[in-house]
Regions:
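A structural "hinge/loop" feature
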Residues: 1, 19, 23, 74-86, ...
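Surface-exposed binding/hinge segments that line
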Residues: 6-8, 43-93
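Gly/Pro-rich hinge or "lid" segments in bacterial periplasmic/extracellular proteins
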Residues: 80-138, 142, 152, 256-257, ...
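Append "and occasionally in soluble cytosolic enzymes with long acidic Gly/Pro-rich linkers
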Residues: 128, 203-304, 388
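Ligand-site clamp/hinge motif
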Residues: 129-175, 303, 312-314, 319-320
Length: 436
C-alpha cells in the first residue's frame, strides 16, 4: 500500500546564505508542513501529511527517496513545489520571525531583496538580481513592489509611477482603457470568486443551506461583468474552470421557497421581515474589502436577496489593506472573496471539503470520500470523485459559494515584455524585461 517517489535536485542550487538545497531542505519542508495541528502555523498540510519518510538515496544528498504511507495522487505540482530553508525548522522563526523582516538570506531565485529594500512604513519591497542564483540571469535591474489601494494604484500608473496595474473591474477598466502609453492585456483569471461562509459564526447548517438556496448568483455575476468586454457562464465549482474536461456544475439550483422551508423546518419562525428562533432574529454581516462601486452593488443585491428569504444582513465594509487580517483570522460571517484555481482538482477538493481544514466542520462521510479520492490513480476517475465530493458538500455543509471566475485584465506599458495574463503558465521573473 506504500508509494515511493524519487526526487533529484540540482547540485548547483543554494539558498542565498550559501546553504545547499539538498536532502536537509527536503526533510525540513516535509517536517514543517506535515501536521496542520502541530507547532507550525500552516493553513493545511496538503500532500505532506501522507509522507512516511524522506531519505537520501545511497548517501547522495541530491537524490531523495520519498515514501508515502499510502498511495497519493497526483504528486507533480504538489510535492516540493516550494522548498524551505532548514533554518525554518525553528518554530519561532517560522511562526513569528518574518514579521517586518523578509529574511532574504533564507530564500533563493533570480531576484533577492535589495539593500534596505524593505520599507514597511512606505510599504515597498525592492528586489535586485541575485548573485547566488544558478539559473539564467534576469533581464531587469530592479523590481519595486508597492502596496496601494486600487484607486491610488491607478492614479500612480497614470502619473508614470507604476508600470502595471490591475484593471479587471468595470470602474478600473473604464479608467485605464484609454490611458496614453498603455495597453490592456487580457486573459481569464484563475479564480473561484464568490461568498465564503464562516461556520464558526454561522453554526446552524440550516442557515448556511438557506443562504446557498436563496442567493441569486447570476445577478451578482451580471453586476460584476456589466460593461466589461467579457462573458462567462456562472460557475458551479470551486475546483476547476468551466473549460476543463473534468468540470461539473455541482452547485444546487436556486430555490428561495425551499430556502424558507429549510429555515422553518429547523425551527425558525417569521417575525416581521426576518426569521427568528428562541427570540433571536437571524442577523449576519457581509464583509467586503475596498471601495469599488461594483463590489458595493453586489453587496446590496446580495443583502436584498437574503431579505427575500428572511435573513437579515448588514454591510461590513473594510479597507482593502485589512483583507489578510480579517480573512486570515476569520473575522467575518460572510465575505466576498475567493481562491485560486488550478488545472487539477485533487488538492482543492481536499482543502475545501475535508473537515480537518475547517476546525471539524464537515461530515465523516465526506472526509472518508476525500481520503479515498487521493488514492485513486486514474485522473478521470479521481476527478469524478472530486465532483461527487463537492456536490455533496455543497448540499450538506455549505461553506463556499462560487459565482464568478472573471477576467484577468492588466494595464501594462506596451514595451514591457513577458508580463500580463498567463492563465496556467507560471510567471518567470527572469524573462520579464523591456523591449527596445
Amino acid at each position: 500500500s506504500e508509494m515511493c517517489i524519487r526526487d533529484s535536485l540540482n547540485p548547483k542550487a543554494v539558498f542565498n546564505d550559501g546553504t545547499p538545497i539538498d536532502i536537509d531542505a527536503l526533510k525540513a519542508t516535509w517536517q514543517i508542513q506535515r501536521d496542520p495541528d502541530g507547532e507550525y502555523k500552516i493553513a493545511a498540510a496538503g500532500i505532506y501529511e501522507f509522507i512516511e519518510s524522506v531519505e537520501a538515496i545511497d548517501g547522495d544528498r541530491y537524490h531523495a527517496r520519498v515514501v508515502f504511507k499510502t498511495a497519493h495522487n497526483p504528486v507533480k505540482g504538489l510535492l516540493f513545489g516550494g522548498i524551505l530553508h532548514p533554518a525554518m525548522l525553528d518554530v519561532n522563526l517560522f511562526n513569528e520571525g518574518f514579521v517586518d523582516n523578509p529574511h532574504p538570506e533564507l530564500g533563493c531565485g533570480p531576484f533577492t531583496l535589495a539593500p534596505n529594500g524593505w520599507n514597511s512604513s512606505e510599504k515597498t519591497f525592492t528586489a535586485v538580481p541575485n548573485d547566488k542564483w544558478w539559473g539564467e540571469k534576469p533581464k531587469l535591474d530592479r523590481i519595486v513592489v508597492r502596496e496601494m489601494a486600487d484607486a491610488a494604484a491607478r492614479a500612480a500608473y497614470k502619473n508614470g509611477e507604476l508600470d502595471v496595474v490591475e484593471s479587471r473591474t468595470l470602474s478600473a477598466y473604464n479608467e485605464m482603457k484609454d490611458v496614453a502609453n498603455s495597453e490592456i492585456r487580457r486573459g481569464r483569471r484563475l479564480f473561484a470568486g464568490g461568498m465564503n461562509l464562516n461556520a464558526e459564526h454561522i453554526t446552524d447548517v440550516a442557515v448556511r443551506k438557506a443562504i446557498f438556496l436563496g442567493i441569486d448568483r447570476g445577478a451578482l455575476a451580471k453586476i460584476r461583468f456589466q460593461g466589461l468586454p467579457y462573458e462567462e457562464e456562472v460557475p458551479g465549482s470551486m475546483l476547476l474552470l468551466g473549460s476543463s474536461q473534468y468540470y461539473r456544475d455541482n452547485y444546487p439550483a436556486r430555490n428561495p421557497e425551499e430556502a424558507r422551508k429549510v429555515l422553518e423546518k429547523a425551527g425558525y419562525t417569521k417575525s416581521g421581515d426576518f426569521y427568528a428562533k428562541d427570540g433571536k432574529t437571524i442577523t449576519l454581516k457581509l464583509t467586503t474589502f475596498g471601495d469599488d462601486a461594483t463590489t458595493k452593488g453586489q453587496a446590496q443585491t446580495f443583502i436584498q436577496s437574503m431579505k427575500e428569504i428572511g435573513i437579515n444582513f448588514e454591510l461590513d465594509s473594510r479597507a482593502q489593506s485589512e483583507f489578510s487580517k480579517v480573512v486570515g483570522n476569520r473575522e467575518y460571517d460572510v465575505s466576498i472573496s475567493g481562491f485560486g484555481v488550478t488545472s487539477e482538482p485533487t488538492s482543492a477538493a481536499e482543502y475545501f471539503y475535508h473537515s480537518k481544514n475547517w476546525n471539524g466542520v464537515g461530515t465523516p462521510e465526506i472526509d472518508a470520500m476525500v481520503d479515498e479520492m487521493v488514492t485513486i490513480l486514474d485522473d478521470a476517475k479521481r476527478a469524478e470523485k472530486c465532483n461527487e465530493i463537492e456536490k455533496k458538500h455543497m448540499s450538506e455543509v455549505c461553506l463556499f459559494i462560487p459565482f464568478l471566475n472573471g477576467p484577468d485584465f492588466k494595464a501594462c506599458r506596451p514595451k514591457l515584455a513577458n508580463y500580463g495574463a498567463f492563465l496556467f503558465r507560471s510567471l518567470d521573473w527572469s524573462t520579464v524585461g523591456w523591449m527596445a
